[in-house]
């Protein structure tokens, strides 16, 4: 029986993703398909041949649900959403935040607990503000993490499209 290797693909939680241009460049270099998932229209550069737009309903978490349902080993999920990161990891996907943080099965529990605690503290008025502004250092860390994830998947037998 000849089993074809799985193709690496990138699934992007695209509504507020600050690194879409970087994803397009890396995907082009590695010949990888990209799926931008959003609940509204997202412009795609004309030369981004491997990028597909997936528009879901405007129902709460519809984009997250689509990404989680389509996550699998060989997929790289780009999201800042911690619950979505957890769901994608459960399906075997690699998960990277736009700031370059790599989520793993061994770290996601603490990350999810911290997120829930901070949400509770914000709701109670104990903590104000949000995350630090996105920086060039974050962009660089993201590019490094994405390249490393692709290399690891290729070494594990996944292929470029």
Curated annotation (Swiss-Prot):
InterPro entries named in the record: UPF0178
Coiled-coil zones: none
TM region(s), chain numbering: none
Taxonomic superkingdom: Bacteria
UniProt record similarity statement: Belongs to the UPF0178 family.
Descriptive protein name: UPF0178 protein Oant_1002
Species per Swiss-Prot/TrEMBL record: Brucella anthropi (strain ATCC 49188 / DSM 6882 / CCUG 24695 / JCM 21032 / LMG 3331 / NBRC 15819 / NCTC 12168 / Alc 37)
